[in-house]
Amino acid sequence: MKISREKGKRAERQWRDEFRAHGYAARRGQQFSGSPGSPDVVCDDLPMYHFEVKHVEHLNLSAAMVQARRDAGGKAAFVAHRKNYWPWLVTMDAERLYRLFQRDLTGEWATRMAAEFSPAQACGEVDWVHCQIITGRRLNIHEAVAQARREAGRRAFVVGHQDRDGRWLVTMTSETFFKFLRGELPPAN
């Protein structure tokens, strides 16, 4: 148990360092067994974001998102995750991706998204991002990200997938995530 706890702390420090490398002040959260006031990593520049950090070889992404949502206390839930020898990935609810696209979630666009609410539909309207959709099989997120990277060419890429309850999730590299945060990717059409 001590080894896995130390691995968790190390992962939290690494994710904190990712924030710092991208110009955000961040620190490890106060750990109180997953209470809403204790995200794994706190970024004062993003007070409405809750980050659950995982460093495991075989992550149950659905369970991690359930935990992140539960612990988020009304904030936007994200799972920052990686496995050995892979870069950091960030997974979020699809609606959060639309907000990162700086889309107005009202009006005609929201009505169309509510009908399908799939990342492919949103990404289909944005020519500078490739959205790889994975359905109908057990998800290996790292294989899906590698495939999306190959197919995207020079475009940004995300992987859309559904959790065990059918909710759409989106996973992207931390590099893409931080570019979205800084607004460095082209705006939506």
Regions picked out by a protein language model, each given a short descriptive name:
Residues M1-N189:
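Catalytic phosphate/metal-binding cores of nucleic-acid and nucleotide-processing enzymes, i.e., regions
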